[in-house]
């Protein structure tokens, strides 16, 4: 894609441009190219260890790949940087659901709920735990 080509050019010119790697990772996430997303997002967190958003997107990519332990680590890094960001708590909860730890997951979704931007998604996840039959396909 054109966006992919431009981002690849940008990071070739400046291999320390963490946001370029993050944006490429997000693009791959959207395209469901999860291993490439992880590769770029992981690299972006090595360059810039202070941006919660990079760790949030990395956690999301790991969750899509069902790499629960790595998702937990990335989500925890996100939360350590920005405690009130609901997205980090949501990804942490999703990873705990993957680990079959519903009690812990619910606690994390309750934290995510405190962030207005993430409330609806968190409430949906809590409802999935409380009423699993409703969501069975």
Explain the meaning of each model-derived region:
Residues 16, 50-51, 84, 117-118:
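Short coil loop/turn residues that delineate tetratricopeptide repeat
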Residues 10, 17-30:
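N-terminal leader/targeting helix
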Residues 13, 47, 81, 114-115:
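Structural marker of alpha-solenoid helical repeat scaffolds
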């Amino acid at each position: 894609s054109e966006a992919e080509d431009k981002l690849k050019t940008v990071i070739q010119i400046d291999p320390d441009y963490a946001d370029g790697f993050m944006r490429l990772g997000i693009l791959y996430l959207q395209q469901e190219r999860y291993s490439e997303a992880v590769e770029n997002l992981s690299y972006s967190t090595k360059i810039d260890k202070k941006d919660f958003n990079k760790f949030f997107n990395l956690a999301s990519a790991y969750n899509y790949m069902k790499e629960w332990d790595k998702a937990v680590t990335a989500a925890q890094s996100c939360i350590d940087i920005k405690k009130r960001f609901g997205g980090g708590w949501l990804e942490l909860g999703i990873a705990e659901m993957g680990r079959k730890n519903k009690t812990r997951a619910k606690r994390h979704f309750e934290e995510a709920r405190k962030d207005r931007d993430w409330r609806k998604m968190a409430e949906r996840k809590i409802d999935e735990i409380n009423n699993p039959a409703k969501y069975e396909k």
